[in-house]
Amino acid sequence: MSSKKETKVTKVTNHRLDICNKTLYQITNLKTAIIHNNLEDFFHTFTSISNLCYEFDDQVNIMEDPNSLWYSSSTMIDCLHNIEEGIFSNNLFSTVCNIYTLECMVNTAMDSIDKES
């Protein structure tokens, strides 16, 4: 008989990276809602992104990670507010610029996260 040892590899989820990925997905949903002029989806997605911003803040505070770059949730919420203002004032340029800014914030945060932790 051969005795084989089974080892279980437990992958630890990087919650911050997971939140960033969810946020990027929601930003895509936000774009789709705007393109299809669906305000119900827009506000649902808007709320989801807001919640993810606060959730990420909580994760950074729990982890006490000084190396993780993240724009504060208030900065992200301000950006969302600017998107909302652009929508209601029919300012497509402002809306697109602010969505791009929001996307850049999340991508920058993702790049600063250690993918192995």
Give short role names for the model-derived ranges.
Residues 1-10:
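Short Lys/Arg-rich cationic patches that frequently serve as NLS/NoLS or arginine-rich RNA/DNA-binding motifs
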Residues 15, 21-117:
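Long, low-complexity or tandemly repetitive, helically biased scaffold regions used
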